């Protein structure tokens, strides 16, 4: 397995980092609807979803190693948004799953190469590129309960030096029932288009133009799953990018990218102006990277520039506001001996609102042999408040939301890890970390933002992967995170939003024409919000522990045709992914109960 945690390809076992990979094979066999579904079972990753899908209402909030400050990339290009309240990137709206080659989840601060705001980690989505002449087409359709329908077309190929891919899809969904059998208002009518066109320049060089489009109409409950009042919304996102990769010499490569991402949504439209939430967000960016590889040294350097804008926000702040950031970075991996390596790095950011900041880093690796690698990392981070946290208008009866006096969140992460192959069929990883942050930016009384002081996060994760024989395989991952409560009226782990322990289990079976995967996710000690805005204790602690099991199966009955099925939440577990929910009969966002999906796939 080759990964790019250091922005250069290397074997996964050699990476001085805690990296998990979701492969295209796993995406195809488990039929994930979006990137959020694909990464939520990665140990150390927690996804806050307000219902059946982040496509309905707010997109899913991502946490890695306890931090919501995560950088999301597609082919190395930034996809974070700036201006919304509940998300850092719209990963539930990244639904072009056939176009994905693999997803790398880098856990732990990665500030030097990926951005000083990558406090928790990085999700890098690597898309497919046709490498051999020929054309491949995939057609897929599926139906399920809760009025779910899904249709997808994917075509990719290469002819001479020209390569391309085209993906189009439509998804429909209706009301669902939670684990208690209660109906939850839900409607989705979404479509997406993705076009990639490239030219192979030879000598490991190419130029690629990519365009993505996502549109959706949705209906959600007004406030919590028990609400009988429905609110309507619309989303309209698009992204365009141009990327040039070149091998300038045997030792020197270059990657240049320019991109523009746009997100538009209207939530609660059709109601009074005071209830409408309409917003446009736009990001424009340019990046360039040079990598020089010698016998015992890999030098990586470059610059990133991006500008975040909120062109429209219902005529209130942050409408018309923008921020920009330019950064220069340099990292040098030096092989001191055949076993020891050291990687110093530095990133210098200049933020238009918060000035210049330097983020140094240091990594030390010891490769005991071909099967064992130890590493120690020290990384710093610098997270500027987003425009919503700075400028959002106040809410009647609740007080101010935005706070123009916020300071950037700063700190460092120290981690130690081991990557080890016990045998050809058994591998494992272990990682332990400590993060210290100051000027922590948090909600106060559920609405306004303040710097609440310091925070110390301790955690570790353990993963094992085993191939028993040609048919059976299994994996197990455990992660532990502890963040002390920041006030007497708060719970641990960001007031109970995050679980202390998570256990992820996967069992796979593979035969000539049949395969199946059983996945389980155990959440332990996620106590939820301790008190509501009035100080009254919530009932979240009664639902602090639960298990959710999913099953996916595929049967290839001809060379071109495959029948597939999914059962989600097999045991009809009642739960919520939103730790800030308070009462199952009040402010509560239920996840779907047991639900089914069956479909056909044709490839030719």
Please give the residue ranges for each predicted region.
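Gram-negative outer-membrane beta-barrel transporters
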Residues: 335-342, 432-436, 451-533, 559-562, ...
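Periplasmic-side early beta-strands and strand-to-turn transitions of outer-membrane beta-barrels
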Residues: 112, 124, 132-134, 140-142, ...
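Short acidic/polar hinge/loop motifs at secondary-structure boundaries
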Residues: 61, 78-107, 403
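Surface-exposed extracellular loop regions of Gram-negative outer-membrane beta-barrel proteins
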Residues: 215-217, 264, 309, 316-317, ...
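Outer-membrane beta-barrel signature, preferentially recognizing the C-terminal barrel domain
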Residues: 225-247, 279, 367, 373, ...
């Amino acid at each position: 397995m080759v990964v790019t945690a250091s922005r250069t390809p290397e074997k996964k076992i050699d990476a001085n980092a805690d990296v998990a990979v979701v492969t295209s094979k796993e995406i195809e066999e488990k039929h994930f609807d979006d990137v959020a579904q694909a990464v939520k079972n990665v140990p150390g990753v927690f996804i806050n979803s307000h219902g059946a899908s982040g496509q309905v209402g707010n997109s899913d909030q991502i946490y890695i190693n306890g931090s919501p400050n995560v950088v999301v990339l597609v082919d190395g290009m930034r996809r974070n948004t700036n201006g919304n309240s509940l998300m850092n990137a719209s990963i539930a709206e990244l639904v072009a799953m056939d176009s994905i080659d693999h997803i790398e989840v880098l856990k732990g601060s990665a500030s030097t190469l990926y951005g000083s705001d990558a406090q928790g980690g990085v999700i890098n989505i690597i898309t497919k590129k046709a490498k051999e002449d020929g054309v491949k087409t995939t057609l897929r359709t599926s139906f399920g309960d809760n009025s779910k329908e899904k249709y997808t077309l994917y075509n990719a190929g290469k002819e001479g030096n020209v390569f391309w891919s085209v993906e189009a899809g439509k998804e429909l969904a209706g009301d669902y029932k939670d684990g208690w059998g209660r109906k939850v208002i839900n409607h989705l009518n979404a479509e997406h288009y993705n076009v990639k066109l490239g030219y192979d320049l030879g000598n490991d060089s190419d130029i690629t133009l990519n365009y993505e489009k996502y549109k959706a109409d949705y209906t959600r409950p007004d406030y919590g799953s028990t609400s009988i009042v429905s609110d309507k919304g619309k989303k309209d996102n698009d992204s365009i990018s141009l990327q040039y990769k070149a091998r300038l010499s045997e030792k020197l490569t270059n990657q240049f990218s320019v991109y523009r991402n746009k997100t538009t949504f209207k939530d609660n439209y059709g109601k009074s102006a005071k209830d409408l939430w309409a917003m446009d967000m736009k990001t424009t960016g340019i990046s360039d990277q040079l990598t020089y590889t010698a016998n015992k040294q890999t030098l990586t350097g470059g610059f990133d520039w991006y500008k975040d804008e909120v062109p429209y926000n219902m005529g209130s702040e942050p409408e018309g506001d923008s921020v920009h950031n330019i950064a220069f970075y340099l990292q040098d991996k030096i092989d001191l001996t055949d076993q020891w390596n050291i990687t110093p790095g530095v990133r210098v950011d200049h933020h238009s609102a918060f000035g210049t900041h330097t983020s140094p880093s240091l990594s030390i690796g010891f490769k005991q042999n071909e099967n064992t690698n130890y590493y120690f990392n020290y990384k710093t981070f610098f997270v500027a408040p987003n425009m919503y946290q700075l400028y959002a208008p106040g809410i009647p009866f609740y007080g101010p939301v935005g706070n123009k006096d916020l300071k950037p969140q700063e700190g460092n992460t120290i981690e130690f890890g081991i990557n080890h192959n016990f045998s050809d069929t058994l591998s494992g990883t272990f990682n332990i970390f400590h993060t210290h942050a100051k000027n922590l930016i948090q909600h106060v009384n559920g609405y306004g933002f303040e710097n609440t002081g310091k925070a110390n996060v301790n955690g570790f994760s353990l993963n094992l992967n085993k191939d028993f024989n040609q048919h059976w395989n299994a994996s197990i991952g455990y992660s532990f995170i502890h963040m002390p409560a920041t006030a007497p009226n708060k719970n641990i782990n960001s007031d109970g939003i995050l679980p202390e322990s998570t256990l992820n289990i996967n069992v796979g079976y593979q035969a000539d024409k049949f395969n199946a995967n059983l996945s389980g996710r155990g959440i332990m000690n996620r106590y939820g919000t301790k008190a509501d805005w009035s100080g009254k204790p919530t009932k979240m602690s009664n639902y602090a522990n639960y298990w959710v099991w999913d099953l996916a199966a595929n049967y290839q009955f001809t060379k071109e045709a495959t029948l597939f099925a999914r059962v989600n939440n097999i045991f009809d577990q009642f739960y919520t992914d939103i730790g800030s929910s308070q009462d199952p009969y009040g402010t509560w966002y239920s996840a779907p109960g047991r639900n089914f999906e069956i479909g056909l796939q044709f490839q030719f």
